[in-house]
């Protein structure tokens, strides 16, 4: 498919997840409706990850595409009808007998994802070492956490140009090269092993490089170690605490077999969230989630949340923006050359600010323009004028004077306060 065809095919899929409930706003949101170019709901302004939008099939397609053309193709399967790669995530079902008075009932626990290891006991141990609220048990808080992190850590628009908004043919080409590069140089999937197994792998790898002369010495050294020494010789790369013998550890092939992590420590170095499904990006001695690895390589537009591949873009308020996306967060008018106010780290045009966000003057009860001087005390505001900032009793101007605040009123003296409050 040529670049022109790819560009024409692009779309944000506005029908996807339409009407899905917001997990954050609950009934306050009428249901998910995707903004034309922002990755947020038009109704409540929350992100896609805050809504119950993605189905398991859509998640598996996204991760399947991420693993396409990588060494992790064993984790995907291609659909016969359209050839789309699907992520073969490992679902683990544990059946635990529960004793009852007369008979034994069966308690079945389904994990929506589990480490793809042959030893189910090891996978069970891994899960138990995660915080309970982050264990992806079907229908639980942990399953919802995993779903949210899939959306947050691995945005589809960080790997698929067709999920982006109006890229030029040149930007499509640059993005494809960028994705190919990070798949080859940074993308990885963690593996769960016992620390001793990792040492064997590392020793085998060293033997390939240094010949057989070191083999007998290495084996002899391992045999001489007591159980206590074995338990203390491994430490977590993140928290530096010792690994307990018999506990599973996570390793990342790109980091090397000499580095281990506790299951709960296998997190992104930027957001400190568990790396969803142990999918990591390795750079300069650090683990990243997909989002924050990409952020370390490319500027990200604070408006549309996409990576910026254009040479020209705007920097404002410590953030980056596509030229066409530096817009009012409320009405989407372009803000280049206009007065704007930052509200919760989002730029808002002057009219929208006055209408929806401005402080109200206690004197005249009108909105206070962002460029006008004002007096603020606790949660009360006044225009800094002779007409508004007055004694609530005698109307004396209080600008530059001492005053006594009482429940939204201000007084020039104790006498005026007594008169008004009596």
Curated annotation (Swiss-Prot):
Biased composition (Polar residues): 205-217
PROSITE patterns: LIM_DOMAIN_1, LIM_DOMAIN_2, PET
GO CC, one annotated term: cytoplasm
Subcellular location field: Cytoplasm; Cell junction, Focal adhesion
GO BP field: negative regulation of cell population proliferation
Origin superkingdom: Eukaryota
Short name of any one Pfam family annotated for the protein: LIM
Main location: cytoplasm
Ranges for domain PET: 92-199
Annotated LIM zinc-binding domain residues: 234-297, 299-359, 362-422
Swiss-Prot/TrEMBL keywords: Cell junction, Cytoplasm, LIM domain, Metal-binding, Repeat, Zinc
Coiled-coil stretches noted in the UniProt entry, renumbered to this chain: none
GO molecular function annotation: zinc ion binding
Keyword Zinc included in the entry's annotation: yes
Region (Disordered): 198-224
Keyword Transferase among record annotations: no
Record-linked PANTHER family: LIM DOMAIN-CONTAINING PROTEIN (PTHR24211), TESTIN (PTHR24211:SF1)
Family: Belongs to the prickle / espinas / testin family.
Function: Scaffold protein that may play a role in cell adhesion, cell spreading and in the reorganization of the actin cytoskeleton. May play a role in the regulation of cell proliferation. May inhibit cell growth.
Domain notes: The N-terminal and the C-terminal halves of the protein can associate with each other, thereby hindering interactions with other proteins.
Full protein name: Testin
Species classification: Eukaryota, Metazoa, Chordata, Craniata, Vertebrata
Gene (UniProt): TES
